[in-house]
Amino acid sequence: MQTSAQKVIQDLTNRVQAEKEELEQLERERDLWKYNAQMNDKEALRGNERKKNIMKKGGPLCYFCNKNHVPSLCRTYPDGISRQKSLENQGKCIKCLKIGHQNGDNFCEKHHIVCRTCQQSHVKAVCPILYPKKDTPPKILRARRRSLIRAQKKKDFQEPENKHEQLTSTKAPCQENWSDF
């Protein structure tokens, strides 16, 4: 016969185990969702012969660890900085992921590529903002996101190149409104 304290401990242990299993299930579903999103991403599939050929052969798919999984789900190199170092060690470019020119703008066919998240010149899979180190404090992550949002807003609200066009386009509707009176 169990004492009431033992029953409480057993009940708590069961609850913790159930919560742990539920969390693991959610993580598996999240990983599957990310994988499906990656596979459905037109940009990721368009024109990437390496991925198509490797998927047909059943060989490695990840650019970072050369194992058979989607690069964005790489657990060997989970953060952007370690992924960049992996590419560097393999002699690959962080813009086009090809071997041979290691980020030389003059030689890379994708020298114009810009990450939409951090505005740096690299592919999305190596972005240190999208894929931060796990031990990065939340305060730093929030600060990075805020600075990115500010930079994006600043970019969105920059003055147009032709100020004359801006003035004429804003005056036209006002003149129409005043002429109605």
Curated annotation (Swiss-Prot):
Residues 154-166 have a biased composition (Basic and acidic residues). It comes from the Eukaryota. Residues 151-181 are annotated as: Disordered. Residues 167-181 have a biased composition (Polar residues). It comes from Caenorhabditis elegans. This is Uncharacterized protein T16H12.2. The lineage of its organism: Eukaryota, Metazoa, Ecdysozoa, Nematoda, Chromadorea.
